[in-house]
Amino acid sequence: ETLKRFFPEAKVFTTDMNPRLAPAAYVSDGCFEVLRVTDPNYIQQILKLCKDNEIGMIIPTIDTELLVLAENKKLFDDNNIFVSVTSLDFIRVCRDKRNTGEFFEKHGIRVPKPIDKKHPTFPLFAKPYDGSLSTNLHYIKNEEELTTEILEDPKLLFMEYIDKEVYKEYTVDMYYGKDNKVKCIVPRERIKIRAGEINKGLTEKEPLTQYLYDRLETIEGCVGCICIQVF
């Protein structure tokens, strides 16, 4: 509705592997069936759809699309199609939680302390460095729960457990312009979670808005929306 208000002739198209089951397909101006994002022909298919339908901008909405679109951004630029995606380097920071922790510490934001899995202290928390949707997460209260399977998982990071009964948990949406400067910060308390996504929340301005603005006013290579979870 906002787009139509400023650009009455504009159209919004969507894509999905199964348009018949995609809610956005029923409200957009058209929905195209596409390959899985990992398919080697995905990019060429998206490029052809853009050319055939005079689409000038691509806005990805799930994190699995970001890397492949960033890797092919020049291809779309050469065809006068703008991809609203951050730089490849910053996406690598976000997609690998080992890099994410270093990024936050560099900007003066504390992260959970790492724990040596060979000499653990309890309780602890383990999660994959490339995980999403709250999969393969482990809250471990004692040595008996620290199984061999968990210890031998090469993707798991081990860290101190942050108790949600003690600390409030927030999801913060931040929007960055083409100048890599933040334009909007919206913190929401995570009251109820489903599959890693906030299902019920409460928007609160302070104290996070100023705290994050002071530390993340500018992020090199960051364009569009990012999402941060903090306690």
Task: Give residue spans per PLM region.
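ATP-binding N-terminal substructure of ATP-dependent carboxylate-amine bond-forming enzymes
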Residues: E1-S84
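Short loop/helix-cap segments at secondary-structure boundaries that form the rim of catalytic
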Residues: R20-S28, K117-F122, T148-E152
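Conserved residues at the C-terminal ends of beta-strands
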Residues: V34, T61, K117, R188, ...
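Glycine-/Pro-rich loop/turn segments that contact NAD(P) or position catalytic residues
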Residues: D77, I81, L88-K113
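ATP-grasp fold ATP-binding core
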Residues: F104, V111-D116, P120-Y139, P154-E165, ...
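Phosphate-binding site of ATP-dependent enzymes
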Residues: K141-C222, F231
